[in-house]
Amino acid sequence: MIDTHCHIDDPQYAEGLDAFLAEQRQDGVECILVPGVDKTSVKDVLEVCDRYPEYLFPALGLHPENVKEDWHEQLATIKAAVDARMHQLPTVNSNLIAIGEIGLDYHWDTTFKEQQHEALRKQMRWAEQYNLPVMIHSRDATEDTLNILREFPSVKGVMHCFSGSHEVAKQVIDMGYYLGIGGVLTFKNCKLAEHLVGIPLERLVLETDAPYMAPVPYRGKRNESRWMRHVAERLAEVYNCSVEHIIKTTTANAKALFVIKL
């Protein structure tokens, strides 16, 4: 399994991280992708990934909830880090795996709605510049998000923590994007399983959004990458196939999208 979205730089994981990651590896997690969310997370994401250079892979970006008055400064700091990272001599894990976590979020506040749009466009241009995939966050902003993504047809990526309708899922995959499937699939009364019917398994990747969104039966706890197996088990029911087939296919999908060589 590959966890395509895990905030392992969160302080909740600081204590005992060596043992924690050893447990994930032992239970079938091949590697973990670690997105940034703002300028302060740049240092944390890169440092933790550099400590485990063949297991943790970094992404950098400005999360839409963090687009505030200082968004220009935020983007300038993050872009400088992106440029520096991409111009390093390549090693196993020196370069970025993606631009992310980026997108639009209107759930709590739309004060900076237009600034979110411009921040997303700027970061999509970074992805164009470096031929990197993107990790897209979209909450209560589906139409605007998809419209902006369509402005950049050469950029591909994943719709992180997907929980939308079948129609939206179709639009996303028709654009060449993947759907990031996490713990929400296991939640009671979740309609996502119905919405995935007819969506090719070849367009799905697994993720956690850890430390959040732990799947049943661990809902409410600090999430772990190895618990993606519960998501895979639910997907096996949806696609009427073995758990092993789900894991093999989603792992291959993640490796293809993010150009991961293990």
Stretch-by-stretch model annotation:
Residues M1-L262:
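Mid-domain alpha/beta scaffold segments of enzyme catalytic cores
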